[in-house]
Amino acid sequence: MKLFIFTCLLAVALAKHKSEQQSSSEESVSISQEKFKDKNMDTISSEETICASLCKEATKNTPKMAFFSRSSSEEFADIHRENKKDQLYQKWMVPQYNPDFYQRPVVMSPWNQIYTRPYPIVLPTLGKEQISTIEDILKKTTAVESSSSSSTEKSTDVFIKKTKMDEVQKLIQSLLNIIHEYSQKAFWSQTLEDVDQYLKFVMPWNHYNTNADQVDASQERQA
């Protein structure tokens, strides 16, 4: 009898324990489901707020995006136009600015030719004395010609011809002497230097425009 009562009590205790476990497990499941639902609602609300903010920013930035797209298209058109210009310049070789002419002298070898620098030949001007002598010579020639034409006798013609030839030779010799004096005064270069002239393209931001000054022969000799 006691054994039967003990078994009944044990069975009732086990049944209560099982029911408590089931109820606790059901409560934990329901709590976890509620937490999951709360998390889902939070994520959905956060996603909705993010979408709303993005939509607002997109609506605000639509004119800016349109402006940027328009400016980018204009820049692309400008770049395309500049490329066409560059192609034309490369095709026709049109200089962008006035190039500088640079004369490069060719250096001669010293063992086969004397190196002399070419100078501009400046002939000296005639003075008053030289002009007066030339005028006197011309007057004498005209006087001799007039005297020879006026004479009629043969003997006088022969004598006049001889004197005329002598005077003409003297005039020629005097003119040659004057030319010789001026040729010694003038500077004549024995050999002319060969100058190769070519076109050199230089950039305007790294080149200073320098013009070659003309050298005066008289100043060079005085120095």
Curated annotation (Swiss-Prot):
Phosphoserine carried by residues: 23-25, 28, 46, 71-73, 132, 147, 155
Tissue expr: Mammary gland specific. Secreted in milk.
Sequence repeats: 76-128, 129-223
Subcellular compartments: Secreted
Gene Ontology molecular-function annotations: protein homodimerization activity; zymogen binding
Signal peptide: 1-15
Annotated Pfam families: Casein
GO CC entries: extracellular space
Main location (coarse class): secreted
InterPro entries: Alpha-s2_casein, Casein, Casein_CS
Keywords: Milk protein, Phosphoprotein, Repeat, Secreted, Signal
Disulfide pattern: none
Function statement: Important role in the capacity of milk to transport calcium phosphate.
UniProt similarity note: Belongs to the alpha-casein family.
Stored PANTHER family: ALPHA-S2-CASEIN-LIKE B (PTHR16656:SF5)
Protein name, as recorded: Alpha-S2-casein
Organism, scientific name: Cavia porcellus
UniProt lineage: Eukaryota, Metazoa, Chordata, Craniata, Vertebrata
